[in-house]
């Protein structure tokens, strides 16, 4: 199993690479790519960690060597948020980066599963889909927007509030990966109940958690370490499913039946070919139903922005 990380010299990429080097199954290959010249050195640094995961690093404009034979490609390349920016302010720079890298994936490893981490995910996934479609290699079961950070944050905040072990809590999060489009389904957390005020406050905190980190880092960056952990969790789940493990479920932002929007984050059963089944979002509370209806315009606009970027 070969996993490629594109954007591997950045804050998210390095954290992700470290976690994959220590947690990928024995015999896996990990390839790191970034435009930055330090990237081969990041791979050498990680190669000293005693795990049976082969690692190589590549830098420069061309990601081909890193992508050859990749089964999973995780893309975290791009610029990070600064205070006062929201994820959509990143669009102007990151859209071009994602387009370029996905073109290279389409050419070199068209059958790979692709996880897009680069923000704004609501839009960059649409860009990736259109690029793959133009290349004639788009498979909607193999393209994912990685929203796992919203899930791990939800799990953490709910566990803190309710005095639970974080590992015991699993909150499904649907919609998108920015602001109001992030919708934690708190009504579906087993064995935990919330007041209306708690639901409103928690939902808002989960939606704004990225900003919480950006502000706390005082201009020095955005959520890189927790995002690295979230991306590793998703990537490792995907690897387990591709290797035949049954019953692997993760939420991610994928193209579905278009019931809510062309792309939508929902629980997915993963399998040997990527998405095996898009699971139902279940019964929503009145608060959640209202929030879902209220976000769709924003989500659809985000998606259209990505489609237009490629097709203009």
UniProtKB/Swiss-Prot annotation:
GO terms for biological process: malate metabolic process; tricarboxylic acid cycle. NAD(+) binds at residues 7-13, 34, 94, 117-119, 227. One of its GO terms (molecular function) is L-malate dehydrogenase (NAD+) activity. It comes from the Bacteria. Its EC number is 1.1.1.37. The keyword Lipid metabolism does not apply. The active site is at residue 177. It holds the Pfam family Ldh_1_N. One of its GO terms (cellular component) is cytoplasm. InterPro entries: L-lactate/malate_DH, Lactate/malate_DH_C, Lactate/malate_DH_N, Lactate_DH/Glyco_Ohase_4_C, Malate_DH_AS, Malate_DH_type1, Malate_DH_type1_bac, NAD(P)-bd_dom_sf. Keywords: NAD, Oxidoreductase, Tricarboxylic acid cycle. The keyword Ribosomal protein does not apply. It catalyses: (S)-malate + NAD(+) = oxaloacetate + NADH + H(+). It is an enzyme of class 1 (oxidoreductase). Substrate binds at residues 81, 87, 119, 153. Catalyzes the reversible oxidation of malate to oxaloacetate. Homodimer. NCBIfam families: MDH_euk_gproteo. Belongs to the LDH/MDH superfamily. MDH type 1 family. This is Malate dehydrogenase. It comes from Escherichia coli (strain ATCC 8739 / DSM 1576 / NBRC 3972 / NCIMB 8545 / WDCM 00012 / Crooks). The gene is mdh.
